[in-house]
Amino acid sequence: SGGVGRMLQQRFEVNSERTLLSLPSVDTPADVLPADAQLPLDGLDPFVTPNGDFYRIDTALVVPQVSKDSWKLVIDGMVDNPMELTFDDLLARPQVERYITLSCVSNPVGGDLIGNALWQGVLLRDVLEEAGVQPEATQIVSRSIDDWTAGTPTEVVMDGRDAMLAIAMNGEPLPARHGYPVRMVVPGLYGYVSATKWVTRIELTRW
């Protein structure tokens, strides 16, 4: 019972932390949606998927409860300047917003394992350029706090498609079930090779 109590306490503390968190202003906002972005058709999902309806696929039996105050991101491997970033470090960096669609590789035609959201965060390319990615580093291995890993092509993150370290989703801090305090979001890739939630390490390596 003690373990359950601690888990519930951590959940309460993280939810309270999220409620009190003020997001930084956005330096590069997303394009304004046209008035007709949402078609008036019965049964058609909204253009922006509400956070509560956004699909969740991961290997965590219990949603990790990670405080922004203890969170750190290590960037190492085949880089010239290994880095360790705190949540405050991310907040102090230029913030971008982008509408990005995520999909699970298992999503069938017409399935619900797909969602589109307005994400806010820091461009991962900028952080990696600061770390000095070595030319031979063809793969990014991202690791979550529960030791889940994903391998992402380095060239995809660096090609200008606005892959990011996201801190917010649809105008609010990431929900815990979607990776609070920080997750990866990479446009154009299935989640299993890119969308690491509760990300704590990014290692540059080879395939």
Write out the residue ranges for each language-model feature.
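Structured, non-membrane catalytic/scaffold regions adjacent to prosthetic-group chemistry
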Residues: 6-207
